[in-house]
Structures are given as structure tokens and as C-alpha cells.
Amino acid sequence: MNTLLLKLTITTAGISLLTSNPMHGQVSPTTPKAARVQIIKGPEIEMSKELLTIIRWTSNNPGGSPEHYGVVHYGTDPNNLSQTAKSPIRLNPDHASTVFRVRLDNLKPGTTYYYTVGSMEAQGTDDGTKSVVKQFTTPAESQRARR
């Protein structure tokens, strides 16, 4: 009987180790959703190079699920923002505001892009805010790259 109990204990401990996830202990609690999410700073270009640009903005803390995404819809036609870039962020329930940063890759040098920004929960629920259409132009191709 003691051997059976020992085997059961070892098996249970092994299964527990194999199926445990240390991230479960780090998940922030869900917080009340903000009545209205507003962009309070930006959006603005944090960095722009030939092939990539990072767009940053700050909103009040949207609340809800701790896992969110900053979302940028962009394109070369202000009436057809057909491309989307997203970047994950974990909300801090103790902060009144949230800074979103989204990286746009594979851009064309010397090209004007138009964009809007917003945010959503990880499961896809939109936070209900969207910026006006803004624009930026990527730097032209460098001399070094042309050689």
C-alpha cells in the first residue's frame, strides 16, 4: 500500500511540473473597463528609418483584460488604410494611462504613409477609440544602400 501511495504521489508531482506554467502567477487581474478610452498624447512618430517606423501614443488605461494590443491601420492612400500592425502590451492596473508602441515593418523608402491608431483586448474587443488620420514619410534610400 505504501508503494502504491508513493507511486501516486510521484506521478501527481510529475504531472504537476509538466503542466504548470509560471506565467499563470504573473497574470494581472482584470480591471474595470474605462467608461471612455481617449488618446491623451500623440500619436507621434517615435522613430522612422528606411524600412520601419515606430508609432507611439498614450491613452487613459482602457481596463478590462490585462492583455491588450496597440493597433495601427495604415497605407499609402488616406482613404484605404488596408494594412494593419499590432503590438501586445500588458496593462498595469495601478497606472492611470497606458503607452502604446507599434512597429511598422517592410515599408518603402521615401514613401508617404497614412495611419490611424487604436487599441483592443487580446480576444479582439475594440476599446472604442481611434485617432484621426495622420501621416509620415519614410526617409529616402541612403546612398550606402544604393551602391
What are these regions (language model features)?
Residues 1-9:
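Bacterial N-terminal signal peptides that target proteins for export
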Residues 9-16:
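Bacterial N-terminal signal peptides
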Residues 26-147:
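Short, surface-exposed linear motifs at loops/turns and structural transition points
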Residues 16-24:
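C-terminal segment of classical bacterial N-terminal signal peptides
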